Amino acid sequence: YEICNEPNGNVTWNYNVKPYAETVIPVIRANTNAIILVGSPTWSQDLHEAAKNPINAENIMYTCHFYAGTHTDWLRQRIADCGLPVFVSEWGTSAADGNGGVYLDEAQRWIDFMNERGISWANWSLCDKNESSAALLNGANVNDGISEDELTESGKFVFKNF
């Protein structure tokens, strides 16, 4: 379960996200083995706020979202410093808007960082939309599976790193 996906705007950890999570978690616990992923403010990047006042429950992980063309060393340091179990539930090889080219060097830094720390991840996005972060070429036919010749530069990088 991922609750509070990318909270943003005037949302705070202490007054919005954490109280909501503490209300929803007991309901989810009907499935006693469920891992619950909780986002933090600023599009799941304020892990330092969650670290100051973590949720007191079992099987909780905190999500982080990043884009290689926008989020660099400062966010990696924030993750390293937070001391929380982290799952990267969204990341892309592009800038945060999904475009701006593919930043393979920075994406590799992120892959290395996550691998060194045993951080699991999900990439954005498995689609054929005409944007840098898309894994599939525009018009790709995926009815019979995905072939390498239907992958974008981003898609090839991501699939290589699974």
Model-derived features with residue positions:
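Extracellular glycoside hydrolase catalytic/binding regions
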Residues: 4-120, 124-128, 133-160
